[in-house]
Each structure stands twice: as structure tokens, then as C-alpha cells.
UniProtKB/Swiss-Prot annotation:
Residues reported in the UniProt entry to bind a divalent metal cation: 255, 295, 306-307
Family named by the database record: Belongs to the DXO/Dom3Z family.
Name the UniProt record assigns to this protein: Decapping and exoribonuclease protein 1
Sequence positions that bind substrate: 101, 293, 308, 330
Location of the region described as Disordered in the Swiss-Prot/TrEMBL record: 31-56
Record field: compositional bias (Low complexity): 41-53
GO molecular function, one term: nucleotide binding
EC category name: hydrolase
Gene that specifies this protein: DXO1
Free-text remark on how the cofactor is bound: Divalent metal cation.
GO cellular component: cytoplasm; cytosol; nucleus
A Pfam short name: RAI1
PANTHER family, per database record: DECAPPING AND EXORIBONUCLEASE PROTEIN 1 (PTHR12395:SF25), DOM-3 RELATED (PTHR12395)
Length: 442
């Protein structure tokens, strides 16, 4: 057997270990058009044997595709009695970041705090909750839209707070490399992890794509792929459609309505976004530093509160179940989080109700055996979402490791990672690093 065949077999065996979770009713991902484990090789028979040995690392077969059939997951009908607590088995907040400065996580006064009566909803009886909510109901959630200035797309995707934190850590630990995982540390904004996870639960997704850049010492960054999501600047809060813009703005107005003003403002007096930096471990080999935007802090329960604004929800509506799964995933990436949902009238924009959920209660709302089964989107099973999230990150790290020039190199190398319509994860090496990618130490 040739050396190259040995290498391919070795990679295939490695893949068998991806996400082999000891969970009940394991199922294998089905792929209509099978993407076999693909490798490429730049070997040449014209090279001398000595050159071939010396350049083995350069010419070894490179893994470029991991098929969906490698994904083993819980049965879609198997809703766990107790939902997973967090997305990763180990997560902790390590710093707050706002207006260009880092702060200790104890500075909760920097985060918009829930107003007192809203903060107390988490422990209120139905009658008490109704009384506390009354003064807030009926508010026009489309008000003040003309004054609102959203974050730019580049600000939305920036990991500069993470890099600032790493730089400070290195100053305090001279001569050491910053590592959360022994092999890889992924630096990313939270929405990239959410998007990777939710790809599996939206059959309308054609492709999920992002740029992954290796910067040496095991440091990876996830970044927006500008070429593949150019429509982002025309969607959501950035849309030219006034109705779509109103719907998206209502969430920001709801935040302003139920929170006290933050103490942090920019030079114009506008409220600055505040981020929590979270260190998480997927395994001993892979860690993450995640930038999570914060909506509010509950000073009564001392929890981070995610604020959402939706039209009235029906769990018989697939879109609504998907929204709640996405919210559950999002809050699972920021430790000690709960959820407050404002329900609005779709036409008038009036606030109809305010509902508090723990992550467990929210999960039980959309993961219930009495709900219609949606096989195409894996029944929005929360446990499968966790397994798929882990699988994606492990697969990306494995693909990058197989395609970088040298693990110890400090020269940035960028790759396009795509999840296609068949849920295969594919890597393409880029000749240059895209301009929108932020680089550590530069």
C-alpha cells in the first residue's frame, strides 16, 4: 500500500471519531447526493525519491470535503427530559467590552438593566405578572424608527474586542501563546456559530458560507464571506422595504422600552453596544473565544437576558418553532442567560404581551411530543442542534488542519468554508486573505 493511501485511510479513520456521541437512538445524516470524503494530492511521479520524502508534508493528500453521512445524531423524536444546559460543556464570561474599552465582568452597571417591574417577571405568579406588565403594554414599537442608527455590517462582524482581550492576556503572560483548546482556539462573533447551527434546520438554505483564517499558534477566526452574503446589506434592519425595516426595528424599540439607560455612550451621546467575551471549550483540543452582544441584565435574578420581539407565536407554525430554536441556541452561547419575549401586533406595532422564559421552558415550548413532526428540518430537536454545532466546528478545524501549510506558521492563510444543500462541509483555500478579515496583531 502506498504512503498516500496510508494517509487517506488515516484521515478516514479520524473522521469516524467526529462527534460519536454516546446518545440514544443515534441516526446517520442522510445525503441525497453523496459527497464522499474527498482528498486532493499535489504529488508528482517525476520527483526523485529523496525529494518526495522531503516534501511529503507538502504533497500529502488534503481533505477537502466532509460528507453529511459522517454526522451521527440523536433521533429527531427523542426530546430529552432535561434539555442541554449550554451549547458547550464549559463556558465562562471573561470580560465586557464597550466603546473601545475592556472591563471586568463585574461591571454589570454598564449593561442596560431591566426596569424593576420587568425584572421581577421571572418569579411572578400569573396575576402578579399581569399587574407588572400593564404599564408597558400598548406601546408603539414602531415609534422612533427615524432616529435609529444600526451598527454597520463591519461593526456587527468585528472580532476586535476578542483580539484586544488576547493582547492584554499576552501582556500579562509574556512568552506564552493564548490557547483555550490545546490545538485550536476559534475567535468569532456569536452569530457565525448560530448560523452554522441553524443551517441544518432550514430546508430553504442553499448554502452557508464563511471565511476561516489561520493566524498561527492554533488561532482561527471566523468571518463573514462578503461574496456569498452581499444581500445582507439589503436585508433586515438594512432593508429598503419600510415594512421589513419596521418589523426588525421593533426589537430595538422593545429593548429601549423595558431597560434603563446604559451608562456607556459614544461621543454623540448615543448608547454604545456592549459585548460579553466568552471562553468556551468544545473539547480539550478545541476552544472558542466568542463575542456576544448583550441586550440586558436582570439585577433581580442576576442573569443575562436576551430580548426578542415577535408576532404572536404558534408552535404549529414551522417558522415560529425555528425562531425559538434559534433563540435557544443563541442564549446557550452566553452563560447564565434567560429570555424575555415581547409580542407585537403585526399591523399597528403595539406591544401586546411580555413573556419570560428560562432556556429550559423555552426548549419545552418548541420541543414537545404533541407537536406536528417536521422531518425535513429534524423536528427542531435541540439536542441535534447541539450535536450539529459541535460537528461543524470539529469538521472545520479538521479541514483547516489538513490544508494549512504549517501549523507553526504565523503567515495568515484564509479558506472559504461552505455547507452545501446536502449538508456536506467543503473547504477551498484562498490565494489571499479578504480585505474584511481582521488579523491579530495587525
Amino acid at each position: 500500500m502506498s504512503t498516500e493511501q496510508d494517509a487517506v485511510l488515516g484521515l478516514a479513520k479520524d473522521l469516524e471519531g467526529i462527534n460519536l456521541l454516546t446518545v440514544p437512538n443515534l441516526e446517520r445524516g442522510h445525503q441525497s447526493k453523496l459527497c464522499k470524503e474527498k482528498t486532493t494530492s499535489d504529488s508528482s511521479s517525476s520527483r526523485k525519491p529523496s525529494q518526495q520524502r522531503d516534501n511529503y508534508r507538502k504533497r500529502r493528500p488534503k481533505l477537502i470535503c466532509i460528507p453529511y453521512t459522517s454526522f451521527l445524531h440523536t433521533g429527531m423524536h427523542n426530546f430529552l427530559t432535561k434539555p442541554p444546559r449550554d451549547i458547550f460543556h464549559e463556558s465562562k464570561e471573561v470580560a465586557l467590552f464597550t466603546n473601545g474599552r475592556a472591563y471586568t465582568i463585574l461591571r454589570k452597571d454598564l449593561i442596560p438593566n431591566l426596569k424593576e417591574s420587568i425584572a421581577e417577571l421571572y418569579e411572578s405568579s400569573l396575576l402578579e405578572a399581569k399587574k407588572r406588565k400593564v404599564p408597558y403594554l400598548g406601546h408603539d414599537l414602531f415609534a422612533n424608527i427615524d432616529e435609529f442608527v444600526p451598527m454597520t455590517i463591519s461593526e456587527l462582524d468585528s472580532v476586535s474586542p476578542c483580539f484586544s482581550y488576547i493582547e492584554n492576556w499576552i501582556l500579562d503572560n509574556p512568552g506564552k501563546d493564548f490557547k483555550i483548546g490545546k490545538k485550536f482556539t476559534v475567535v468569532t462573533t456569536r452569530h457565525h456559530i448560530v448560523d452554522l447551527t441553524m443551517h441544518l434546520f432550514n430546508r430553504r438554505n442553499r448554502q452557508t458560507s464563511l471565511i476561516v483564517t489561520y493566524m498561527g499558534a492554533g488561532l482561527l477566526s471566523f468571518c463573514r464571506n462578503v461574496k456569498k452574503d452581499s444581500q445582507m446589506s439589503k436585508e433586515g434592519i438594512y432593508s429598503n422595504d419600510p415594512n421589513m425595516k419596521k418589523i426588525c426595528y421593533s426589537g430595538f424599540e422593545f429593548e429601549n422600552w423595558v431597560t434603563e439607560n446604559s451608562k456607556v455612550a459614544d461621543l454623540t451621546g448615543s448608547k454604545c453596544p456592549i459585548f460579553s467575551l466568552v471562553e468556551s471549550k468544545l473539547s480539550e483540543e478545541i476552544g472558542l473565544l466568542i463575542r456576544c452582544e448583550m441586550d440586558a441584565f436582570n439585577p433581580v435574578s442576576e442573569t443575562n437576558t436576551e430580548l426578542k420581539c415577535f408576532a404572536p407565536l404558534s408552535m404549529h407554525n414551522s417558522n415560529h418553532r425555528r425562531k425559538l430554536l434559534k433563540t435557544w441556541v443563541q442564549t446557550g452561547l452566553l452563560p447564565n442567560s434567560d429570555i424575555m419575549i415581547g409580542l407585537r401586533d403585526s399591523h399597528s406595532g403595539q406591544l401586546l404581551d411580555i413573556q419570560w422564559y428560562s432556556r429550559d421552558l423555552l426548549c419545552k415550548k418548541f420541543n414537545h411530543p404533541g407537536l406536528p413532526t417536521n422531518k425535513k428540518e429534524l423536528n427542531y430537536n435541540a439536542q441535534i442542534a447541539v450535536e450539529w454545532c459541535h460537528y461543524c466546528i470539529e469538521a472545520i478545524c479538521k479541514l483547516v488542519e489538513a490544508n494549512i501549510s504549517d501549523y507553526s506558521s504565523t503567515k495568515p492563510e484564509s479558506f472559504e468554508i461552505g455547507i452545501d444543500t446536502n449538508n456536506a462541509i467543503v473547504i477551498t483555500k484562498l490565494k489571499t486573505t479578504p480585505r474584511n478579515v481582521e488579523l491579530f496583531g495587525m
